[in-house]
């Protein structure tokens, strides 16, 4: 019921305001003025006072007021709070007893029954009846405003009422506040939903939030793998992916929701968004494998040194090794240059030495670095007649990076122009000082052609090996490094493995990077099969699942299942990292490409004989790309050219290049039928030069302007046919007809066009030389003035090449 003033209530119950004030005073309500508002609680108190003042049976019957109302009550059971909409039937009888008990201690004075008191009682009865009717009328009016949706269940009504009656007054007040706040929402919900008492869970979900707003930012510890997508990163931080993309845009990186980012980038983003990154290493399988194998048990015994021969191209590295092995290895190399690593072991009178012959061409930097990585001693070959060259300096840098000692072999001393002292001087500028100059580097003059000084060189190598005290365990599971790998037709993937410790046997399970397999055959450097290989022994291994990457570590695993798991894990990780780098590079260049013109591309399908040559060729060809033309190697591999390679070239309009490999008969038929450009090469110089020529043809033509002559306007004539004719004096060069011209005024170009007519004494001429007057007609231009200059020039196309 709404609050009203005492005067309004008196008008409603049809009594005087003064009489009502007296009754309120008797009921203990502190209201002294007729304009004061009276609350619902004070009305109830007045009503109870009037009821208790009449104790007759009739009054008792009248004192039972039944209120039917629709109300939202809140019932709490444990942690749950349920709002239930009920229609209650209420009888006010119990508060009368409580009121009586409260008023028992107070002494009451009996009023004698007189005619005045009788009249007073009758008036009170009228007031009580009228007040009851007013209360019922207001209840009905409220019920009309909020029509009921469902009749009360007879069993639930008393139970809910009983629970409510046990609640304290404070909770009742909170219930009324809850009802007041949700009144409008409940009315809207009632209009559309069927009348039905909701379940406790659904009612709680609709009427109250299931969580509270955090008062402080939530800082989470985000576990980051080696690569993660933007969507997964957002989920780990419990934010939307758009927020992560915004944060990365602020950091200057453009990403998409499904793009993979590396661990370092993800850690920066997590810290930027206020969380703590936790880096996770996913190579647990590999760590467990290393822990399982542990240290190799056994006694370390002396082993042969692994010697890498380095130097500039054509300085005689392979010829030196050829003389040592007493074979003609050089004659088998195309063009007389080494294009992949050769691993050989040589038995000398002083002991065994394993040699690695690396290429000297600049494109084989990675192969040279790989050779220095798995070597003990570097023999630097320098031609006495050529001096220190760029690849010589690079070999010195590789040796220093690998922290291995260097022995300098000054080759070709048999030539008359040889100057070993000049070699020492040039090497000293690179901090390679000979022992006789106070340094620590051994120098040995040799001749790979006559054999002079070779025995002394071997002695120096073995002396250096004794100083290093090279030892290794010669039993147990083998470990090694892949020096080279290739795909052999008929034998499958072949890997040249240099054993560093342990002993490799036939049938061992070998894990090499992303490849694994059982060793089916081992072939020594002399071409003969062997059953085992110890430390410092190079062997060719057959039986791997694919061609491994040169430079990978090879390790013998006792369990094939474990080797398969690790290999597959490495393959997946390699793919994720490769995709992440590819997407990152693509998005970083997207805005750069928007402002550029179309870039011409030369697509290439590249096949090589060994993995090392393939890497060197790929790097060398990619270096040829410029801003205008680009080399795009769409596919590369080790082995012969197959029909699938040709079909790929047809689909992508590519050139097929084979380096020391050939196409089989069905593939050649397909090439001839489809007209695919197939080229074979065996020398890297020729391959790079041909690709340069092809790229030069893709370059946009470039024109050079050459000023032929300059004429100064002395007078202007008008012609009915041509228009303005400029009478000119040729001051420089020659003015020729049909050449492009520029009209200059105050040394500013105001028009570019074509020379339409050239006359001298009313005769058409082809050219006019310096110091001669002539008449010049400019095509489609009549605004020629005295004092202008007419510049005649010609354009010539310049042949462009790739540097």
Curated annotation (Swiss-Prot):
Stored Pfam families: EF-G_D2 (PF22042), GTP_EFTU (PF00009), IF-2 (PF11987), IF2_N (PF04760)
Binding residues annotated for GTP, in chain numbering: 311-318, 357-361, 411-414
PROSITE patterns reported in the protein's UniProt record: G_TR_2, IF2
The tr-type G domain, residue ranges: 302-471
Chain segments carrying region G2: 336-340
Family: Belongs to the TRAFAC class translation factor GTPase superfamily. Classic translation factor GTPase family. IF-2 subfamily.
Protein name, entry field: Translation initiation factor IF-2
Organism: Coxiella burnetii (strain CbuG_Q212)
């Amino acid at each position: 019921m709404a609050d009203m003033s005492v005067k309004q209530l008196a008008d409603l119950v049809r009594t005087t305001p003064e009489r009502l004030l007296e009754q309120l005073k008797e009921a203990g309500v502190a209201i002294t003025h007729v304009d004061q508002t009276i609350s619902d609680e004070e009305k109830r108190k007045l009503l109870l006072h009037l009821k208790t003042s009449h104790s007759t049976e009739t009054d008792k019957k009248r004192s039972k007021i039944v209120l039917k109302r629709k109300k939202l009550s809140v019932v709490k059971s444990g942690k749950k709070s349920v709002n239930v909409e009920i229609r209650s039937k209420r009888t006010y009888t119990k508060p009368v007893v409580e009121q009586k008990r409260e008023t028992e201690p107070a002494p009451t004075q009996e009023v004698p029954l007189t005619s005045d008191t009788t009249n007073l009682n009758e008036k009170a009865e009228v007031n009580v009846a009228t007040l009851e009717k007013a209360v019922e009328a207001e209840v009905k009016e409220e019920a009309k405003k909020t029509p009921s949706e469902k009749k009360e269940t007879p069993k639930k009504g008393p139970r809910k009422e009983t629970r409510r009656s046990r609640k304290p007054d404070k909770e009742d007040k909170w219930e009324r506040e809850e009802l007041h706040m949700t009144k409008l929402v409940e009315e809207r919900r009632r209009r559309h939903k069927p009348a039905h008492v909701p379940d406790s869970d659904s009612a709680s979900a609709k009427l109250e939030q299931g969580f509270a707003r955090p008062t402080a930012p939530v800082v989470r510890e985000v576990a980051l793998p080696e690569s993660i997508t933007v969507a997964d990163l957002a989920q780990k931080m419990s934010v939307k992916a758009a927020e992560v993309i915004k944060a990365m845009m602020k950091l200057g990186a453009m990403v998409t929701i499904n793009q993979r980012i590396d661990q370092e980038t993800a850690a920066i983003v997590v810290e930027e968004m206020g969380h703590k990154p936790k880096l996770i290493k996913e190579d647990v399988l590999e760590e467990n494998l290393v822990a399982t194998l542990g240290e190799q048990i056994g006694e370390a015994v002396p082993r042969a040194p692994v010697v890498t021969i380095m130097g500039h191209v054509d300085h005689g590295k392979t010829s030196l090794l050829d003389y040592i092995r007493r074979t003609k290895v050089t004659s088998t190399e195309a063009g007389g240059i080494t294009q992949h690593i050769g691993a050989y072991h040589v038995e000398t009178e002083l002991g065994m030495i394993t040699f690695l012959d690396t290429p000297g061409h600049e494109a084989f930097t990675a192969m040279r670095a790989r050779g220095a990585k798995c070597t003990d001693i570097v023999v630097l070959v320098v031609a006495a007649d050529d001096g220190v060259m760029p690849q010589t300096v690079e070999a010195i840098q590789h040796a220093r990076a690998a922290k291995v000692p260097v022995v300098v072999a000054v080759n070709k001393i048999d030539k008359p122009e040889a100057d070993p002292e000049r070699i020492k001087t040039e090497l000293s500028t690179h901090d390679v000082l000979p022992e006789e100059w106070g340094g620590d580097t051994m120098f040995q003059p040799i001749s790979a052609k006559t054999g002079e000084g070779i025995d002394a060189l071997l002695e120096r190598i073995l002396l250096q090996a004794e100083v290093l005290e090279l030892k290794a365990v010669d039993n147990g599971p083998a470990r090694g490094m892949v020096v080279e790998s290739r795909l052999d037709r008929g034998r499958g993937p072949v890997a040249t493995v240099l054993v560093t410790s342990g002993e490799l046997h036939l049938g061992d399970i070998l894990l090499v990077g992303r490849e694994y397999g059982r060793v089916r055959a081992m072939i020594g450097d002399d071409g003969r099969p062997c059953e085992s290989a110890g430390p410092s022994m190079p062997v060719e291994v057959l039986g791997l699942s694919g061609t491994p990457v040169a430079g990978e570590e090879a390790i013998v695993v006792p369990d094939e299942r474990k080797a398969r798991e690790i290999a597959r894990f490495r393959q997946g990780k390699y793919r994720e990292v490769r995709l992440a780098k590819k997407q990152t590079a693509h998005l970083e260049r997207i805005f750069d490409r928007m402002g550029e013109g179309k870039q011409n591309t030369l697509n290439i399908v590249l096949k090589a004989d060994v993995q090392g040559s393939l890497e060197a060729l790929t790097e060398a060809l990619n270096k040829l790309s410029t801003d205008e033309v680009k080399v795009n190697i769409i596919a590369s591999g080790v082995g012969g050219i197959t029909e699938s390679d040709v079909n790929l070239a047809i689909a992508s309009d590519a050139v097929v290049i084979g380096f020391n490999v050939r196409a089989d008969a069905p593939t050649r038929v397909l090439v001839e039928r489809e007209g695919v450009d197939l080229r074979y090469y065996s020398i890297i110089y020729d391959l790079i030069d041909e690709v340069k020529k092809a790229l030069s043809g893709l370059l946009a033509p470039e024109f050079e302007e050459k000023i032929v002559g300059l004429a100064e306007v002395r007078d202007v004539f008008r012609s009915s046919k041509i228009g303005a004719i400029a009478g000119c004096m040729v001051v420089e060069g020659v003015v020729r007809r049909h050449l492009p011209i520029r009209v200059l005024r105050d040394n500013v170009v105001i028009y570019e066009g074509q020379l339409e007519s050239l006359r001298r004494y009313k005769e058409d001429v082809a050219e006019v030389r310096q110091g001669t007057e002539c008449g010049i007609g400019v095509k489609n231009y009549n605004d020629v003035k005295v004092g202008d200059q007419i510049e005649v020039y010609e354009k010539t196309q310049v042949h462009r090449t790739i540097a």
